[in-house]
Curated annotation (Swiss-Prot):
GO terms for MF: rRNA binding; structural constituent of ribosome; tRNA binding
Matching NCBIfam families: rpsG_bact (TIGR01029)
Function: One of the primary rRNA binding proteins, it binds directly to 16S rRNA where it nucleates assembly of the head domain of the 30S subunit. Is located at the subunit interface close to the decoding center, probably blocks exit of the E-site tRNA.
Protein name in the entry: Small ribosomal subunit protein uS7
UniProt keyword annotation of Ribonucleoprotein present: yes
Record-linked InterPro entries: Ribosomal_uS7, Ribosomal_uS7_bac/org-type, Ribosomal_uS7_CS, Ribosomal_uS7_dom, Ribosomal_uS7_dom_sf
Domain of life the protein comes from: Bacteria
Similarity section: Belongs to the universal ribosomal protein uS7 family.
PANTHER family (UniProt xref): RIBOSOMAL PROTEIN S7 (PTHR11205)
Assembly and oligomerization: Part of the 30S ribosomal subunit. Contacts proteins S9 and S11.
GO cellular component, one term: small ribosomal subunit
Species, as recorded: Acidothermus cellulolyticus (strain ATCC 43068 / DSM 8971 / 11B)
Length: 156
């Protein structure tokens, strides 16, 4: 382990259009191969699509979607003796937000709409309404943690 301790976390800068670090984090998750301007265009157009469809502030839609996708429990592998147990642990707030954004972008990419803008718009709207594959992923994660509750005493 380095003597200086862990590297400090860099703060996420707020984006210029909405002034929200969440939008910047979403842009960073959509970003591929350094094409930031393309990622920004996708995210901003998707958020405008949310505004057009719902008539509300897209930041509110994004926050509601994140709240519906954000996991509170997950399982971690822990080796005890010769066996590996799936131990349920609580998810730290920063990790839960990161996981939620990652899942939303991942399942948006798997959708069947023509453009990424449409896919992301629909995934955000579905997630904000408690539907969609990203919400199902959270439910599956919680179900897995609940079914392995017997191993909770192996927590570290």
């Amino acid at each position: 382990m380095p003597r200086k301790g862990p590297a400090p976390k860099r703060p996420i800068v707020s984006d210029p259009v909405y002034g929200s670090p969440l939008v910047t984090a979403l842009i960073n998750k959509v970003l591929q191969r350094g094409k930031r301007s393309l990622a920004e265009r996708i995210v901003y157009n998707a958020l405008e699509g949310c505004r057009a469809r719902t008539g509300t502030d897209p930041l509110i839609t994004l926050k509601r979607a994140l709240d519906n996708v954000r996991p509170t429990l997950e399982v971690r592998s822990r080796r005890v003796g010769g066996a590996t147990y799936q131990v349920p642990v609580e998810v730290r707030p920063q990790r839960s937000t990161s996981l939620a954004l990652r899942w939303i972008v991942h399942y948006a990419k798997l959708r069947r709409e023509k453009t990424m803008i449409e896919r992301l718009t629909n995934e955000l709207l579905d997630a904000s309404n408690g539907l969609g594959a990203s919400v199902k992923r959270r439910e599956d994660t919680h179900k897995m943690a609940e079914s392995n509750r017997a191993f909770a005493h192996y927590r570290w």
